[in-house]
Every structure is written in structure tokens, then in C-alpha cells.
Amino acid sequence: MAHKKAAGSTKNGRDSNAKRLGVKRFGGEQVLAGSIIVRQRGTKFHAGDNVGRGKDDTLFAKATGEVAFVTKGKPLRTFVTIKAD
């Protein structure tokens, strides 16, 4: 019988680079307009007051101020807002 013993090792061995997702600025932190607050895939966090959403679902500050995470609505959703100075 013919055996291909090591074929699996050539098909494995790939890994993608980390995408550096997550919250970049936490609640209570001061941010400048244009600062990235959350990098995400999908909308785990939603854009609230003074926050914009990029085409890759990144949330960014539209105004300078303090970051706040607010949970509200039905179904419960977490909104990121900026309390402008």
C-alpha cells in the first residue's frame, strides 16, 4: 500500500496576522475629534452622539470631549457617545 505520510504538514502552517481590534479609548477618557475609539468587526458597539462609524465599522470621535459607553434600548445595545466640551 502506498502511503502519503507527511502531506498534512504541507497543507497546514498558515496563520493570519492579528488585526489589533478592540476598544482604543475607554469611558472617561478625553479624545480629540477624529480619534479612533473602537476598532471592530460588525457592530458590537453602536455610534451615539458625536461619534461616527467608518466603512469597516470603526467608531471615531466627531467632536472633542469625554468618551462614555451607554447601554440602552430593546434589544440592549451599547452606544459610544462623546460628551462635548
UniProtKB/Swiss-Prot annotation:
Protein name: Large ribosomal subunit protein bL27
Source organism superkingdom: Bacteria
Record carries keyword Membrane: no
Pfam families: Ribosomal_L27
Keyword annotations from UniProtKB, A to Z: Ribonucleoprotein, Ribosomal protein
Segments passing through the bilayer: none
Molecular function GO labels: structural constituent of ribosome
Gene from which the chain derives: rpmA
Disordered: annotated segments: 1-21
Keyword Ribosomal protein: yes
Species in which this protein is naturally found: Hydrogenovibrio crunogenus (strain DSM 25203 / XCL-2) (Thiomicrospira crunogena)
GO cellular component, one term: cytosolic large ribosomal subunit
UniProt record, GO biological process: translation
Gene3D superfamilies given in the database record: 2.40.50.100
